[in-house]
Amino acid sequence: MSTTETEHIFRYTHEFSDTIIASAAGAVIRDREGREILDFTSGQMSSILGHAHPEIVATVRDGIERLDHVHSSFLSDPVIEFSRALSDLLPDKLSRVLPLSTGGESNEAALKMAKLATGRYEIVAFDRSWHGITGGAGSATFNGARRGYGAPVPGVLALPTPHAYRSPFASNGDYDWRAELDWGFEMVDRQTTGSL
C-alpha cells in the first residue's frame, strides 16, 4: 500500500494494513492479488452470515430500489414494520425502538439515555472494551485506538476486565475471580466523584 492510497483517509483505530481488499464472499476476503484470507474480523454481519450472502444482497437491493434514505423527521413503512416486529419480541416495558446505524451510534444513544434517566454523568466500562469511536462511546473504549485524540469525555471509569488466563489474581493454578472483581469495584469507588 502506498501513501498516495491513504493520503485522503483518516485512521480511526489502528494503522491500516498493507493488504488492500478487493472482494469478499462467505467467510473469505480476497486482496488485489487474488490471495484468499479467512475473515474473522469484519464485524457481526459478515462474521455470522458471511460476505455477499445472496438473501441479504437481494433484500438490500430491493430496499434501495424503493427507498434508500429519508430525513430523520420522516418515517417509512420499513422503519415502522421493523420497530413493531422488534417491540413485539420484547417485554412490555421495552416497547419503543430507536433505529440507528452502528454500534457506536447505539452506544452513544444508550449513554445519553442513561445520563438523562439518572441525572448523573459517570459510567463504568471494562478496561479491555470496544464501544465505538464517537465521543462518549470512544471515551468508554479502552485500547490503543483511543490514543492521539485528546482528552476523553469526563466521568468514564475503568473496571478491570476479568482475565482468567493471565490474571494477577491467579495463584497455584487457581483463579480468584471474586477477589479480582472486588478489587475492580474498589478501583471504581476510588475513581468516582459520586455521580455514578
Please place each PLM-identified region on the residue numbering.
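Short loop/turn microsegments at loop-to-beta-strand junctions
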Residues: S17-D18, A24-G26, E33, Q44, ...
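Active-site-adjacent loop/helix segments that line or gate small-molecule/cofactor pockets in enzymes
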Residues: M1-V28, I64
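Short, ordered coil/turn segments that flank beta-strands lining enzyme active or ligand-binding pockets
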Residues: R32-E33, R166
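Electropositive phosphate-/nucleotide-binding environments in soluble metabolic enzymes
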Residues: T19-S23, G50, P54, S73-S76, ...
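Sequence-level motif detector for i,i+2 pairs with an aromatic at +2
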Residues: A24, R35, V153-V156
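Glycine-rich loop-to-alpha-helix module at the N-terminal edge of alpha/beta enzyme cores
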Residues: I9-F10, E36-V124
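Short beta-strand-to-turn element immediately C-terminal to the catalytic PLP-Schiff-base lysine
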Residues: R30-D31, L49-H51, S139-T141
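PLP-dependent aspartate aminotransferase-fold enzymes
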Residues: A85-S195
